[in-house]
């Protein structure tokens, strides 16, 4: 029951963001980065998942931001939405909700901080690799005429 309510509120928030012009405003802010923005795109997905604990929620909230930013900087919108999804995986590995659920499952509740400290270096490495793939990948795909 609570899961359904949470998803409804997340989707409602995404719609409010769209109708109020927040998505366009945030996209305009991110477009300042210009052609370098795809490097930062996975970080937005990771942040969304870290905060909400859900990849679906992060995609609902920030997928439109990625598409609008892509239009602003002349990048491939599918590439940036995929970059957001790549960041979602990173955010999920360090999301407090995911860590708490995992620790409860193995009867180690209360050791959240300890596990987060162990996960952060791997998450940081993964997000840096993801950012590099997203940045350089857009040019590689463009060379082959795919993007």
Question: Predicted segment positions?
Answer:
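Helical membrane-embedded segments and adjacent short helical loop/helix-boundary regions
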Residues: 1-7, 37, 121, 126
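Hydrophobic alpha-helical transmembrane segments of multi-pass integral membrane proteins
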Residues: 5-17, 34-65
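Alpha-helical transmembrane segments of multi-pass membrane proteins
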Residues: 6-8, 36-50, 73-97
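Transmembrane helix-loop junctions in multi-pass membrane proteins
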Residues: 14-26, 51, 134-145
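Short glycine/threonine-rich loop-to-helix capping motif typified by GTGT followed
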Residues: 17-23, 56, 97, 101
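Membrane-interface interhelical connector segments
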Residues: 18-35, 64-65, 73
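Hydrophobic transmembrane alpha-helices that form the pore/transport pathway of multi-pass ion
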Residues: 28, 51-85, 122
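Juxtamembrane and boundary regions of transmembrane helices in multi-pass small-molecule transporters
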Residues: 89-147
């Amino acid at each position: 029951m609570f899961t359904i309510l949470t998803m409804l509120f997340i989707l409602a928030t995404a719609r409010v963001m769209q109708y109020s012009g927040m998505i366009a405003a945030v996209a305009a802010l991110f477009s300042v980065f210009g052609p370098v923005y795809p490097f930062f795109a996975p970080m937005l997905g990771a942040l969304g998942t870290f905060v909400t604990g859900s990849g679906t929620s992060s995609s609902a909230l920030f997928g439109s931001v990625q598409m609008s930013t892509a239009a602003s900087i002349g990048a491939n919108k599918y590439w940036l939405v995929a970059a957001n999804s790549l960041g979602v995986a990173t955010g999920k590995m360090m999301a407090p909700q995911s860590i708490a659920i995992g620790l409860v499952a193995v009867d180690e509740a209360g050791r959240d901080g300890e596990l987060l400290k162990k996960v952060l270096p791997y998450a940081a490495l993964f997000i840096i690799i993801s950012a590099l793939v997203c940045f350089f990948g857009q040019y590689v795909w463009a060379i082959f005429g795919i993007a």
